């Protein structure tokens, strides 16, 4: 029933969007380096009128206009994005299909390349904040980005980062207890102490630089570090996606979040494994990262992306 309701809601959003006849843009893309304890790059996708060309970044291929001017007109809403972690390490380039689609739909997307760190729950939210500040201060974007309309998306560990940036508190004692009881959830529990040493670790306090986000989209989110009390401040519209054949247990992650949030989120499931939210792979990437690029029999990753990228664009437009 919930899936039916979501489908109808998204269909209505699509009709409303069509009636509004939003302007058609092409995708611009650029990078900047942000200074931090470990400097990091930020990928920015944005609306432009310049022609797109084929671009290769390592094993990733996409169409965009590199370093083109931002389209003129009204200010554009901003969408922050946090990629996954773990092995293999994540990158926003693995989500270029989605990020560039949002740029063509009239959003400015800010996506840091999170460097490796021993404190990802602390460092990645800070990197998101620094990336946003740097883009809003950049003369190319300062009068084109709307600082009053900011949303955020995250995939896998990036889903946890998204929740923290929105004001959620992590609870390592809760995470440790979950992993003690659910050792089979290896994607959620790798490296997590289950010997009782985390039992008295207090929940984190609210992230000092929590942003006034208007809406969130979570793709296969890492939800095990959160419990109901730590999510109590997140009373905002949210869309949560899960993969039907994921090895990240939904009852401890995506579904657990949906039950614990103060406002019931919209939920959607797609066929495939955890990495189905990564773009369809080039032959080079498939050879380098077969786990990321392999899908269960019958999974049509390209068709799934075509569906959810428009659903996400419609959801963000309705809430930003």
Summary of predicted features, one role per range:
Residues 236, 247-260:
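Short alpha-helix in the alpha/beta-hydrolase fold that links the catalytic acid
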Residues 261-292:
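Catalytic histidine neighborhood in serine/cysteine hydrolases
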Residues 118-151, 160-164, 173-189, 193, ...:
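Alpha/beta-hydrolase active-site loop
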Residues 234, 240-242:
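Short beta-strand/loop motif that positions the catalytic acidic residue
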Residues 21-79:
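Domain-level recognition of soluble alpha/beta enzyme cores
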Residues 283-320:
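Catalytic active-site module of serine/aspartate enzymes centered on a nucleophile-bearing elbow/loop
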Residues 52, 63-120, 246-250:
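Short substrate-entry loop that stabilizes the transition state in hydrolases
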Residues 224-225, 244-249, 275:
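Acidic catalytic loop of the alpha/beta-hydrolase fold
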């Amino acid at each position: 029933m919930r899936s039916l309701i979501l489908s109808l809601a998204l269909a209505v959003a699509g009709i409303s969007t069509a009636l509004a006849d939003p302007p058609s843009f092409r995708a611009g893309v650029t990078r900047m380096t942000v200074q931090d304890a470990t400097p990091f790059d930020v990928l920015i996708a944005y609306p432009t009128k310049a022609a797109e060309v084929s671009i290769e970044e390592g094993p990733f291929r996409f169409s965009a206009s590199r370093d083109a001017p931002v389209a003129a007109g009204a200010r554009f809403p901003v969408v922050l994005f946090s990629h996954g972690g773990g092995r293999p390490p994540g990158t926003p380039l693995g989500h270029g299909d989605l990020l560039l689609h949002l740029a063509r739909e009239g959003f400015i997307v800010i996506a840091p390349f999170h460097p490796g760190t021993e404190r990802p729950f602390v460092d990645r939210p800070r990197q998101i904040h620094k990336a946003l500040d740097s883009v809003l201060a950049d003369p190319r974007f300062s009068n084109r980005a709307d600082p009053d309309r900011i949303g955020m998306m995250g995939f896998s560990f990036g889903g946890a980062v998204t929740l923290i940036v929105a004001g959620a508190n992590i609870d390592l004692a809760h995470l440790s207890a979950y992993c003690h009881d659910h050792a089979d959830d290896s994607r959620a529990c790798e490296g997590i102490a289950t010997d009782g040493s985390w039992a008295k670790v207090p929940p984190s306090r609210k992230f000092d630089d929590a942003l006034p986000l208007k809406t969130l989209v979570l793709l296969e989110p890492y939800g095990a570090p959160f419990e109901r009390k730590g999510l109590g401040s997140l009373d905002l519209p949210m869309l949560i996606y899960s993969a039907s054949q994921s090895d990240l247990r939904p009852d401890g992650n995506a579904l657990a979040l949906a039950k614990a949030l103060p406002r019931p989120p919209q939920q959607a499931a797609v066929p495939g494994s955890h990495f189905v939210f990564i773009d369809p792979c080039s032959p080079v990437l498939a050879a380098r990262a077969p786990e990321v690029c392999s899908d269960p029999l019958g999974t049509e990753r390209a068709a799934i992306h075509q569906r959810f990228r428009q659903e996400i664009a419609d959801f963000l437009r309705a809430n930003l």
